[in-house]
Amino acid sequence: MTESKIAIGTVQFGTNYGVSNKSGVTPVTEVKKIINLAQENNIKYFDTAPVYGESEQVLGKCLNNYGEIITKTISIKNKVISEADIVNIRSEFNRSLKRIKRDSVYALLVHNSNDLTKKGSERLHDELCSLKDEGKIKKIGLSAYTADDIDSVISRYEMDLIQLPVNLFDQRLIHNGYLKSISEKG
């Protein structure tokens, strides 16, 4: 069986999220079933973030070293990124590692694409590169919602991966040719 590129989104493992979510946070017993089903189907990527409630803790409890974690940075509130913001990013990332019970993760995505276009964004990118050099992350990435967001970041910085809002129901970035064009760029 070939490795799947599908990632399981885990926001509902830790918080009551979603327009059609009528049952609240996914119980741990169900999370374990989802992880078992993922293993049976060679799905090994799990997407989480510090802002997803208890999601990271649930993954740390349930994964038992299976799979690859993709997590995200906290958003930077300031208009100009300072050294203090970078210290906060590093500290929160270290807390994420503790919550998921790992020494490293597959990828760290910048959760708010605007953080990579603000004044001082090179500090954030440099910190991501440092984490990669230290072996704490394998991939540097971006979570984005629009083609403009992606373009504004990749014109400044190289990204190993980009998380896009593409699913069975929302395929705008496929149909308008954008996904193909950025794929061709590498």
Predicted regions and their residues:
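N-terminal binding-site loop/beta-alpha segment at the start of enzyme catalytic domains
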Residues: 1-68
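Beta/alpha (TIM)-barrel catalytic core signal, keyed to glycine-rich beta->alpha loops juxtaposed to Asp/Glu
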Residues: 113-186
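Acidic (Asp/Glu)-rich catalytic clusters
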Residues: 2, 59-69, 97-103, 132, ...
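Active-site groove signature of glycoside hydrolases
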Residues: 97-116
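Structural preference for beta-strand elements that scaffold enzyme active sites
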Residues: 3-7, 44-45, 68-70, 104-109, ...
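Short, acidic/polar
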Residues: 22-38, 84-101, 144-153
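Active-site beta-loop-alpha junctions enriched in small/polar residues
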Residues: 11-13, 49-51, 72-76, 110-113, ...
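Acidic-and-aromatic substrate-binding clefts and catalytic sites of carbohydrate-active enzymes
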Residues: 47-57, 77-83, 115-119, 168-174
